[in-house]
């Protein structure tokens, strides 16, 4: 998974902390965590295409949450940034080279055991991400750093 997922998740929480009426530019969100603005902007645009954020152009434009954090799962963000494809792709190497399963070998027609195991693991991972929403993440972040929302709002106001 790319670092863009982490950046996107933090950006969603930061947008919630900034307030519902404030649009925040990609450059300002990037500066808050010392990230490259152009790369973060790509992640934010992906979130906007997925309906997680809205974007508005212009000098007072930027990004806002399109829906409440409680309505956005971690899986929604991962899928928006990484795409919906499975992380593991079996290349069927068991069918190549001197060790290839022959057409009459027992189990050659069956699914690859490794692909099957990886698919089960990915399904569990996706279910776990889908079961947790961004509001739960926001709450945990505020328990860990209660001053963070106010620090962000003050920093944005000073810019």
Give each language-model segment a name.
Residues 3-5, 9-35:
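N-terminal helix-turn-helix DNA-binding core of bacterial DNA-binding proteins
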Residues 12, 44-45:
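Short, hydrophobic-biased segments on the C-terminal half of alpha helices
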Residues 31, 48-49:
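Alpha-helical residues within the helix-turn-helix
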């Amino acid at each position: 998974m790319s670092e863009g997922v982490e950046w996107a998740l933090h950006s969603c929480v930061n947008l919630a902390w900034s307030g519902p009426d404030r649009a925040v530019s990609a450059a300002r969100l990037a500066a808050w965590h010392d990230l490259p603005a152009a790369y973060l902007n790509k992640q934010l645009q992906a979130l906007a295409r997925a309906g997680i954020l809205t974007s508005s152009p212009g000098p007072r434009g930027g990004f806002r949450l399109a829906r409440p954090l409680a309505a956005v799962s971690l899986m929604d963000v991962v899928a928006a940034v990484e795409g919906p494809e499975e992380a593991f792709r079996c290349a069927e190497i068991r069918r190549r080279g001197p060790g290839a399963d022959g057409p009459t070998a027992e189990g050659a027609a069956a699914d690859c055991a490794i692909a099957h195991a990886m698919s089960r693991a990915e399904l569990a991972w996706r279910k776990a991400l889908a079961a947790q929403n961004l509001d739960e993440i926001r709450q945990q972040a505020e328990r860990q750093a209660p001053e963070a929302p106010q620090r962000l709002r003050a920093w944005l106001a000073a810019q």
